[in-house]
């Protein structure tokens, strides 16, 4: 079983949204999953469940660097680190990078620039971060009301909106994670 850890020490960066979208992607293709919501704020649509036949485990973590997080990092095959693209997010992001380097140097790392837009601040952040990401891959999730609306209906943005930049970016992220776990891509319907 492959373990996917969605983590950042900063709250409000989209960890629960991304954990849900990953779980939805695996569910749409019939891939058995376990899901762990470790965040006491309860921001996920999915509830904690353990499937003995699971091929993957998706783990949503709280927004804090806790001692337990290092144990989760050590067990992770893929680490997804969401961040917003503001100057306030730089220091927590750098702390996460250092923690991953120290505790999970062999894990595949995927950075998600959440709330991406075409304005200068997002572009400046991306240009700066390209030099900081090391071997990690970078995916951009756009600012989109579709994420909010889909969540309100308890759905994936892929099922709710079907088309658009939010859907395309979510598919790209999910397929990159799937590939990193050795699971075939989800095809667009």
Describe the predicted segments one by one:
Residues 36-40, 52-69:
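Switch II (G3) loop of P-loop NTPases
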Residues 91-118:
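Conserved C-terminal guanine-recognition region of P-loop GTPase G domains, centered on the G4
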Residues 1-31:
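Walker A (P-loop) phosphate-binding motif
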Residues 34-35, 81, 111-113:
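Structural beta-sheet core signal
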Residues 66-87:
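Inter-motif core of Ras-like GTPase G domains
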Residues 117, 127-158:
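Beta-strand-loop-alpha "switch" segments that mediate conformational coupling across diverse proteins
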Residues 29-44:
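Short beta-strand-centered segment that lines the nucleotide-binding/catalytic pocket of NTP-utilizing
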Residues 148-174:
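Inter-lobe coupling/hinge region of RecA-like P-loop helicase motors
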């Amino acid at each position: 079983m492959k373990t996917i850890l969605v983590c950042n020490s900063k709250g409000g960066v989209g960890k629960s949204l991304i954990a849900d979208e990953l779980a939805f992607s695996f569910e749409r293709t019939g891939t058995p999953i376990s899901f762990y919501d470790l965040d006491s704020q309860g921001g996920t649509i999915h509830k904690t469940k353990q499937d003995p036949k699971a091929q993957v485990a998706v783990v949503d973590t709280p927004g804090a660097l806790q001692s337990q997080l290092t144990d989760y990092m050590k067990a992770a095959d893929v680490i997804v680190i969401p961040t917003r693209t503001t100057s306030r997010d730089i220091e927590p992001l750098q702390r996460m990078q250092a923690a991953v380097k120290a505790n999970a140097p062999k894990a595949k790392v995927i950075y998600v620039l959440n709330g991406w837009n075409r304005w200068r601040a997002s572009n400046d952040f991306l240009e700066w971060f390209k030099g900081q990401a090391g071997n990690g891959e970078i995916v951009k999730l756009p600012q989109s009301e579709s994420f909010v609306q889909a969540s309100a209906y308890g759905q994936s943005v892929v099922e709710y909106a079907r088309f658009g930049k939010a859907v395309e970016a979510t598919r790209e992220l999910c397929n990159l994670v799937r590939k990193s776990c050795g699971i075939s891509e989800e095809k667009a319907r």
